[in-house]
From Swiss-Prot:
Entry's localization field: Secreted
Protein name: Probable exopolygalacturonase X
GO biological processes: cell wall organization; pectin catabolic process
Keywords from the UniProt entry: Cell wall biogenesis/degradation, Disulfide bond, Glycoprotein, Glycosidase, Hydrolase, Repeat, Secreted, Signal
Function comment: Specific in hydrolyzing the terminal glycosidic bond of polygalacturonic acid and oligogalacturonates.
PANTHER family in UniProt: EXOPOLYGALACTURONASE X-1-RELATED (PTHR31736:SF14), PTHR31736
Gene this protein is translated from: pgaX
GO CC list: extracellular region
Upper classification of the organism: Eukaryota, Fungi, Dikarya, Ascomycota, Pezizomycotina
Main location: secreted
Length: 432
């Protein structure tokens, strides 16, 4: 069931297309294939006027020109970033006022490498020290055109190697958007996560091309493709992701999410979590479908990661544990893997290396109604003889976890799973 070659061809074609009409007229619901959103997406109103953003050129800040065009064409217009032009952004842009507007990005939007400015002025979102170059929100907003957003990440990769506590901006911040289409677009060299989708609903991401590696010895770290947070009814599809962390991550209070037709390379898998990081807070992730995924050269394929009930530290800038909540109705269906460490990983000891301590203080989050189906491929062999791990910190917090038609082997031909504190009768895998 290796569909990667033809799949990449199809996605490449999709990424090469950009709308040429005066506004974004394609139905959001019709664009969602083969699986439709949990709730119908609202229609986009016609656009009747066009504004072209003026580029100052020579690396001069174009932020004022961008904001002027957005205000001029808000409520029924289209703002165009012209082809073969570079737009420089050196100012944090609050674009949460947008309504019934399209942004057609044909050229390149590049953010400056002034790390002192961005640490002081980027938008702070609280969760996991997330900050963004800009925040785009409002109602009925479409961003497309096949152009490029460039985060100038190299200076950040090198700076993070010196100081793990710096605040690295996220390239693309969707904050408080109600109804929208994002893509096709190219996202390059994000300092941290590529996209944060927070406090948003009814948004489809379609045809996103993500790539950006370090050119120095310092890796590009924490470069998640998408992180959904406090968001509902989101569709992510038809995209190619070359990165160094989660391909997609469902952060706290992500509900009714469809992820389909992705090619992920170099990632940490498609992950629920991490959840339960903040003591006393309630994290819920439910109603998620992940379908038709190709996963290459990754640490994980499908992943659920939950913090234990005791304080733990994943790294200097990532600590937590003791949170509450639930993970429910999550399905991973049809995943091809190649050179992936774990085909499936479920852990409630995220960030805690002392497993005895973790088991003494089991997670406060429950995991239930989980389905892993139709997996094919070969692991990296790093975990030989195991190819997957489904481990709960207590049988009292895990139930109804299913695995069926899992045809994954290591390079040596083994297919063992680590299965702890789960009902093995529901797992059609070789629990060692």
């Amino acid at each position: 069931m290796k569909f990667s070659y033809s799949f990449v061809q199809v996605v490449s074609l999709l990424l090469s297309l950009s709308p040429s009409v005066e506004g974004f007229t394609r139905s959001r619901n019709d664009a969602c294939k083969p699986n439709h959103p949990f709730r119908p997406l609202p229609p986009s109103q016609p656009r009747t006027k066009t504004c072209h953003v003026v580029s100052n050129g020579h690396g001069k800040d174009d932020s004022k020109n961008i904001m002027q065009a957005l205000h001029k064409c808000n409520n029924g217009g289209k703002v165009v970033f012209d082809a073969n032009k570079v737009y420089t952004v050196g100012t944090a842009l609050d674009m949460t006022f947008l309504k019934h507007i399209d942004l057609e990005v044909l050229g390149k939007i590049q953010f400056t490498n002034d790390t002192d400015y961005w640490q002081a002025h980027s938008f702070k979102h609280g969760f996991q020290n997330a900050t963004t170059f800009f925040q785009l929100g409002g109602q009925d907003v479409n961003v497309y055109g096949g152009g490029t957003f460039d985060g100038n990440g190299q200076v950040w990769y090198d700076l993070y190697a010196e100081d793990a506590l710096i605040l690295r901006p996220i390239l693309f911040g969707i904050i408080g958007l109600k109804g929208g289409t994002i893509g096709p677009l190219k996202l390059r060299y994000s300092p941290q996560w590529y996209q944060l989708v927070a406090n948003s609903s009814d948004v489809i991401f379609d045809g996103i091309d993500i790539s950006g590696y370090s050119s120095s010895k310092n890796e590009a770290k924490n470069t998640d493709g998408w992180d959904t947070y406090r968001s509902d009814n989101i569709v992510i599809q038809n995209s190619v992701i070359n990165n160094g962390d989660d391909c997609v991550s469902f952060k706290p209070n992500s509900t009714n999410i469809i992820v389909q037709n992705l090619h992920c390379n170099g990632s940490h898998g498609i992950s629920v979590g991490s959840l339960g990081q903040y003591k006393g807070e309630v994290d819920i992730v439910q109603n998620v479908l992940v379908y038709n995924i190709s996963m290459y050269n990754a640490s994980d394929g499908a992943r659920i990661k939950v913090w234990p009930g005791v304080s733990s530290a994943m790294s200097e800038d990532l600590q937590g544990g003791g949170g509450l909540g639930s993970v429910k109705n999550i399905t991973y269906n049809q995943m091809y893997i190649e050179n992936v460490d774990w085909a499936i990983e479920v852990t409630q000891c995220y960030g805690q290396k002392n497993l005895t301590l973790c088991n003494e203080h089991p997670s406060n989050l429950t995991i239930s109604d989980i389905h892993f189906k139709n997996f094919r491929g070969t692991t990296s062999g790093k975990r030989d003889p195991d190819v997957g791990t489904i481990v709960c910190s207590s049988p009292n917090v895990c139930s109804d976890i299913h695995a069926e038609n899992i045809n994954v082997k290591s390079p040596k031909g083994t297919d063992e799973f680590v299965c702890t504190n789960v009902d093995k009768s529901l797992l059609d895998v070789n629990c060692a």
